[in-house]
Amino acid sequence: MMKSFGSIRSIFMHADGVDWMLMALGLIGAVGDGFITPIIFFICSKLLNNVGGSSFDDETFMQTVAKNAVALVYVACASWVICFIEGYCWTRTGERQAAKMREKYLKAVLRQDVGYFDLHVTSTSDVITSVSSDSLVIQDFLSEKLPNFLMNTSAFVASYIVGFLLLWRLTIVGFPFIILLLIPGLMYGRALIRISMKIREEYNEAGSIAEQVISSVRTVYAFGSEKKMIEKFSTALQGSVKLGLRQGLAKGIAIGSNGITYAIWGFLTWYGSRMVMNHGSKGGTVSSVIVCVTFGGTSLGQSLSNLKYFSEAFVVGERIMKVINRVPGIDSDNLEGQILEKTRGEVEFNHVKFTYPSRPETPIFDDLCLRVPSGKTVALVGGSGSGKSTVISLLQRFYDPIAGEILIDGLPINKLQVKWLRSQMGLVSQEPVLFATSIKENILFGKEDASMDEVVEAAKASNAHSFISQFPNSYQTQVGERGVQLSGGQKQRIAIARAIIKSPIILLLDEATSALDSESERVVQEALDNASIGRTTIVIAHRLSTIRNADVICVVHNGRIIETGSHEELLEKLDGQYTSLVRLQQVDNKESDHISVEEGQASSLSKDLKYSPKEFIHSTSSNIVRDFPNLSPKDGKSLVPSFKRLMSMNRPEWKHALYGCLGAALFGAVQPIYSYSSGSMVSVYFLASHDQIKEKTRIYVLLFVGLALFTFLSNISQHYGFAYMGEYLTKRIRERMLGKILTFEVNWFDKDENSSGAICSRLAKDANMVRSLVGDRMSLLVQTISAVSITCAIGLVISWRFSIVMMSVQPVIVVCFYTQRVLLKSMSRNAIKGQDESSKLAAEAVSNIRTITAFSSQERIINLLKMVQEGPRKDSARQSWLAGIMLGTSQSLITCVSALNFWYGGKLIADGKMMSKEFLEIFLIFASTGRVIAEAGTMTKDLVKGSDAVASVFAVLDRNTTIEPENPDGYVPKKVKGQISFSNVDFAYPTRPDVIIFQNFSIDIEDGKSTAIVGPSGSGKSTIISLIERFYDPLKGIVKIDGRDIRSCHLRSLRQHIALVSQEPTLFAGTIRENIMYGGASNKIDESEIIEAAKAANAHDFITSLSNGYDTCCGDRGVQLSGGQKQRIAIARAVLKNPSVLLLDEATSALDSQSESVVQDALERLMVGRTSVVIAHRLSTIQKCDTIAVLENGAVVECGNHSSLLAKGPKGAYFSLVSLQRTLF
């Protein structure tokens, strides 16, 4: 009981006084709404008795009919007020409470310590789910599910109250049948939910394969793995097809079982006849009570079906309340603790022991002692996992040590106020975290109340002002999600500006330049050196050249400091750990003794090398860009989708389609036949002869029982048949779409609308929508056409006058039902848009929680959330009024139409133009058919979506790629030597046509030799590899392999002779063996070949040391393996391919020194006897290449081997690059 109370409290914990008032009024409205329909039944019993039993010549007949019809109008007016209150109050309070929940929840999440996120590996996705879908669950529960539950429950109670008031005996007899009405829905509802969850799980596996393939499309193309991936995808889809068929069968049984309602109606009809004959009950009263009993049972069933939403809301509410009430061990909101008036910045670690909360069995520090003097720079170096970055995390109190203490100016940091402590530090990380806002706003994350002058000064100090000023919008330039609109060096300089605007006493630099090229590194390093002046600075770096000027260098190994001293002091220890690390990174040139370029000279040479796309564009683009529109064909929108063409894709399933259509048509006929029979049965109660009543009742009872059985069988046929159609169509569409997508040129994937997430969403949603269109919607359409046709035919035959009037008011009925079922639900689009923006913000904040925590920017994020929600909040207030008006109007109009029908029907009877039996038959037929048409009307929205989905599917299937991988006329090379040449090539990326990469570019690469490409970022190094792989075609000029234009070759055959190893190795979810096998041409590869490839890649030893060896799962994108391990598996994959041409794109740049040494050794073995194109920032990795080409502004400015290029001296471009990276001895 207590837990239940706690769960209820968790849902309403965000309500304030206004919300409680709204909910109280909403409760009155929902209960009143539930009472309306039974009250209408009560009035209708009087009308039926008037119509069925009075003397129609009596003058009082029309007066009585008119009086009861007016009573219905009064009820209609009351229902408008009641339904308006219900619709407005619940919609309004739902939005208000959900908005407050999102704000409190995100605030609570951002308050948590970093260790919380380490222990909850899914915390980011959990937060996104809670801010988006969980808040929608609460909002939907309060706005729709709870009022529906209250309304249906009160309708159940009111129905039985009216039943007891009218005819208590019949009501008591009907009461036990409620159980029979509930069983089918409850039993099969659960089964359908279980199957739906399994289908989602099954498709998630296939969706995961598709996502990996599309996000790694360059790797898939490079290794020719398209067919393998499509086969894997197809196999994964088969499971969801089988479950889909089970779902169709279960749905048919579930809906078919509802036919028991007709059998219950038959029994109550029989018992009602006994009441008429033996107790003198009136026919109208009996009929109304039967309707009340069945309506009450149905209402209870609908009410109980809403209980699952209660449990769902309780779970969500408990989960959110748990986070909101959690007080973290390191609480940034806790304002207790000391604040020092003046801080020197002296840092000391005394005998610190530490393990990460997520890995308590792995000690990081056992007895760490470290002292950082005030105003000095201390560098921490060592291998991966030695604990360098942990020092920074502990100093910022992301975690607390298990033992020992950390002091600042002699005071333990756990005695200091957390927020103040972090304000004294500025952090710059390896991967700079920027938020999707302007440059100015990103810098202000460091200091919220900073003036524009302070922002500019910080930018100048970080060497960022000059490039920011070149942007058209200057400091208002939007950086994009995660700063994608900026280069690595630009992002890093903005991150430095953010760190120094707060004037920190302590500066923390964690691998701040490791991911940058030499030129960007020089500029950023200069900014860091400036920022460090006068500050206590702790530096972590892999590139030892960046920390050689540190006051103290500490070598960290296995969580302890094993060496301390300056650069020169540590180098004196010939066998020292620092010396060995330096040797690994040493640029081996015999002339190093003679390289003594003055710092200023090296700097000026570097500036000469600086690539300025802006200046280059103005001078070169005029003759190229004007031709661009014709060179990048736009995807034309598909023609109006052809339903016939869609059906042709379903041709193999035509037999099942026939069964489905037949079942739908037969079930469509059930409702009008049932309504007609019910109307006829009411008139039977008014017969004078008891024998006639008995005889006719027996016939109708048997008819109702027959309809129950007929409903069961026709639904099974309908739903299984259409499920079979839909499932196989979905599978076929997904296979064809993925197959077609994997023929598209890489440029297609570069567009924002074709990201891996967007494509996978289309594969999932578009195919599902088409299945829904062909399966569910088509069956409903056939069913509706059948019902409407039979209804109109029966009505016109019986009484054309009354039928025409009933037909004329049907649109009103349909619109009212449609409003209740569709429009009210679709009004939340703006709210959902607001949720999307909230989710985006939450995802960005939580995935960058360390940056948020380091800069104490929680309040800033909450303010951004309020801004994001402001628009949807205002829209919601208007929508609440609209919801109330629409709900009230639709309910009252339905009642008014009933009043009109009764009045007009009574008039026709009084005038002798229609019999009472005919009136009852037509009235009930059209009343029920209005609901059927409205039900079909709810699919109009789905038809539009389905039409869009069909267009989307055919847009993919009909699109012609600009780079055909399976050109039947293409030359198929049997053997490739590997001689490569670029002749007068012009190129710009299609997504950035105004940025010219190459103009008149030429280079020759000898076969069997290794050629290195070096140069600053943006000079076009990686573009060379993309053009060789023919990911793109040049705008002008020719790329040749072995003297043949690669555009004339069969592309997939050509790629079989080329292997690519990238900076970030792409592994797929699967075993190590499967990942290596992607390098093979077929699926049948000997184990010995796999092992030989692994040995050649220096991977065999570490693979065999794993518990499952080659059967070890790599995890999604290889997350279970380290960077060096992943890279060696990628090399083994390339070895297995036995390529003639090897392309190495920054293959070791992201590795630490030890991993780099092992991987570099494997690469050098692989390069022997092959044409190799090597791109590298670290020049130590390419000094042994036969040829080194230096690129600048999209042109080769120098070419030769390592020694010959160095011989050119300080004026040489290569010499300048080496100077930037040299380590002095």
Swiss-Prot record:
Family annotation (SUPFAM superfamilies): ABC transporter transmembrane region, P-loop containing nucleoside triphosphate hydrolases
Start and end residues of each ABC transmembrane type-1 domain: 23-312, 657-945
Gene3D superfamilies the record matches: ABC transporter type 1, transmembrane domain, P-loop containing nucleotide triphosphate hydrolases
Family annotation (InterPro entries): AAA+_ATPase, ABC1_TM_dom, ABC1_TM_sf, ABC_transporter-like_ATP-bd, ABC_transporter-like_CS, P-loop_NTPase
Positions of transmembrane segments: 23-43, 70-90, 146-168, 172-194, 252-272, 284-304, 657-677, 699-719, 780-800, 804-824, 880-900, 919-939
Any single Pfam family the record assigns to this protein: ABC_membrane
Localization per record: Membrane
Protein's membrane topology: Multi-pass membrane protein
CDD domains cross-referenced by the UniProt entry: ABC_6TM_Pgp_ABCB1_D1_like (cd18577), ABC_6TM_Pgp_ABCB1_D2_like (cd18578), ABC_MTABC3_MDL1_MDL2 (cd03249)
Keyword Transferase: no
Annotated residues for binding of ATP 1: 382-389
GO cellular component, one term: membrane
Keyword Nucleotide-binding found: yes
Glycosylation sites: 530, 754, 960, 1000, 1201
Gene name per UniProt: ABCB18
Annotated ATP 2 binding sites: 1015-1022
Name of this chain's protein: ABC transporter B family member 18
Similarity comment: family membership: Belongs to the ABC transporter superfamily. ABCB family. Multidrug resistance exporter (TC 3.A.1.201) subfamily.
Assigned keywords, A-Z: ATP-binding, Glycoprotein, Membrane, Nucleotide-binding, Repeat, Transmembrane, Transmembrane helix, Transport
Signal sequence, renumbered to the chain: none
Alphabetized GO MF terms: ABC-type transporter activity; ATP binding; ATP hydrolysis activity
Domain of life of the organism encoding this protein: Eukaryota
Domain ABC transporter residues, every copy: 347-583, 980-1218
Residue runs in coiled coils: none
